[in-house]
Amino acid sequence: MKKFKSFLSPLIQAYVDYQKASERWDETSYGSNLILFDRYCQKQYPIATALSQEIADNWCRKRKTENNNSCRSRIYVVVSFIRYLRKRRKTDIREPEIPRKERRSYIPHAFTEAELKNFFYACDNLLNEPLSRVPRYRRITIPVFFRLLYSSGIRTNEARLLRVEDVDLNQGILDIRYSKGHAQHYVVLHNSMLDIMKEYDAVIRKQYLARTYFFPARGDAFHTRKWVQTNFRQMWDKYNSAYATAYELRHHYATENINRWTDEGFGFDAKLLYLSKSMGHSILESTRYYYSLVPGLAGILKDLTGGTFNEIIPEVDDEESN
C-alpha cells in the first residue's frame, strides 16, 4: 500500500529516502507527523499541484491545544522537508517559524548505587533466560549497550547509530559522527569499557559477519529509539520502583563527573571544556545545564572562580541542554 497519498507524495518519499540514507531519520519521531501532514494535504487541498505558503503556514500554525514544545514536535519534520525542497529549488516558499522551545521543570532521576546495581544485574542475567524467550543477540547486546551509555555519557541515538568503523578498539576512541545538531566529536572509552566492547565485538561478529552498525539490528539496520526505551524499561522495572529513562544515564555521567571536581584539584576551565567536548555540546554554555542538577555546586564554583563565573558559564535557554 502506498504510504503517502497527496500531490506531494513523490517529494515526501524522496525526502524520507534522503534522510534515511543520511542516517538522520527517526521513524518514531518523524514518520507519523509526516503522514499526518500528507493526509492533511490530500484532504484539504485535493486539486493542488504544488506546495504553497498557505498550506505550509496553515499546518504549522500553533494550535489552541498545543504548547510550544508539542507544536515543535509536530511541525519540525515538515519544516525540515520544506528546507530540503528549498535547497533543491523545488519550492520558493519560506520556512514557517518553529516556536521557541519552552523551559521544562523536569528534573532527571538521580540514580542510587543500589538502583544501578539492580539494573545491570537484570541486564547481565538475560544470559540465564531461555533462548526461546530472549534471542542470543539481544542478551549479549543489552548489557554492553547500556554500560556504554553509563560509562561514556553519549546520547542514546549516538550509541544506536555507531558504525563499526566509528569504534577504534585499538585506541579506545569513539567517532561520534551523527549527533544532535550533527556535530562530530570524539569520546575516549574507559579501559574497562573498552575491554567489554572488544569482547562484544568478538562475539557479535560471528553472528553478523559484515555488519554496518556496532550494535546491529535485523536487516543490517540500527536499533530504533523504541528498542532502547522498551529494553531499558524491562530491565529497570525488574528490581527498581522509581521512574527512570535510559537518557538519564547521560545526566548521571555528567553530574558524577562534576561532583568529583569539588574533591580533586580544581583545574576548572580545562575540566569544563573537556566535559563539554566529550558530551558533544557545540557551545560551552550548554554544559551549564548540569550545574543545576548538582546541589550547591553553583555556589562552590562561584566562590572558587570569583567574578569570572558568569562569564565562563552564562545563563542559557536550554535550546541544546542535555
Language model: regions and residue ranges:
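Conserved catalytic core of the tyrosine transesterase superfamily
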Residues: 1-322
